[in-house]
């Protein structure tokens, strides 16, 4: 299963057609009776269990091989990003990723998720990916549970993401629901020609 749901699709057109807008918006279900502290402690696989399986949990972009992350993006069908811009985005994001401890290359992610927001009220989850050879091992769930727990632990109450229909079920199992207020995401779109005209 490819974890492609949480990537932004602003202005992306697939080959042979126009991309339908908008993608479904999902929000973390805050209607439960659990406190932020209880949510922050709720992970299905502990860090020590992941370590025993050969995966180290990382909560910072420090040490992350951005080139290797870009390779994972490409293998799951995400567009490659300019590395310097990706580094800047990571500096302004909450990040959770898993490193393969057995790998000879330090900093290579096998699972990754990030969220950006105001740090107080709102966050949007982006770029949830799992290395294709590691899919089906619960690593996507592991990074998402930790990312949500970290955000909730900091008091962020509105956590949203945009999901492709084929992975909505995955996010529902993690506590996300279609936006209960029926707020719909919108995307600002400019064609490549419009972008070129404004930059020249």
UniProtKB/Swiss-Prot annotation:
Upregulation: Down-regulated by cadmium.
Enzyme Commission numbers on file = 2.3.1.87
One GO molecular function term of this record is: aralkylamine N-acetyltransferase activity
Organelle targeting sequence: 1-41
Keywords for this protein: Acyltransferase, Chloroplast, Cytoplasm, Melatonin biosynthesis, Plastid, Transferase, Transit peptide
Gene3D superfamilies recorded: 3.40.630.30
Q: In which pathway does it act?
A: Aromatic compound metabolism; melatonin biosynthesis; melatonin from serotonin: step 1/2
GO CC aspect terms: chloroplast; cytoplasm
Q: Where in the cell is it found?
A: Cytoplasm; Plastid, Chloroplast
The biological processes this protein is annotated with in GO are: melatonin biosynthetic process
Record field: pH dependence: Optimum pH is 8.8.
**Reactions performed catalytically:** serotonin + acetyl-CoA = N-acetylserotonin + CoA + H(+); tyramine + acetyl-CoA = N-acetyltyramine + CoA + H(+); tryptamine + acetyl-CoA = N-acetyltryptamine + CoA + H(+); 5-methoxytryptamine + acetyl-CoA = melatonin + CoA + H(+)
Q: Which Pfam families match?
A: Acetyltransf_1
Q: How does activity depend on temperature?
A: Optimum temperature is 45 degrees Celsius.
Matching entries from InterPro entries are given as:
Acyl_CoA_acyltransferase, GNAT_dom, NSI-like
Which ranges carry the N-acetyltransferase domain?
A: 55-195
Q: Which SUPFAM superfamilies match?
A: Acyl-CoA N-acyltransferases (Nat) (SSF55729)
Q: Which PROSITE patterns match?
A: GNAT
Q: What exactly does this protein do?
A: Catalyzes the N-acetylation of serotonin into N-acetylserotonin, the penultimate step in the synthesis of melatonin. Catalyzes in vitro the N-acetylation of tryptamine to produce N-acetyltryptamine, 5-methoxytryptamine to produce melatonin and tyramine to produce N-acetyltyramine.
Q: Quote the protein name from its UniProt record.
A: Serotonin N-acetyltransferase 2, chloroplastic
- Give the lineage: Eukaryota, Viridiplantae, Streptophyta, Embryophyta, Tracheophyta
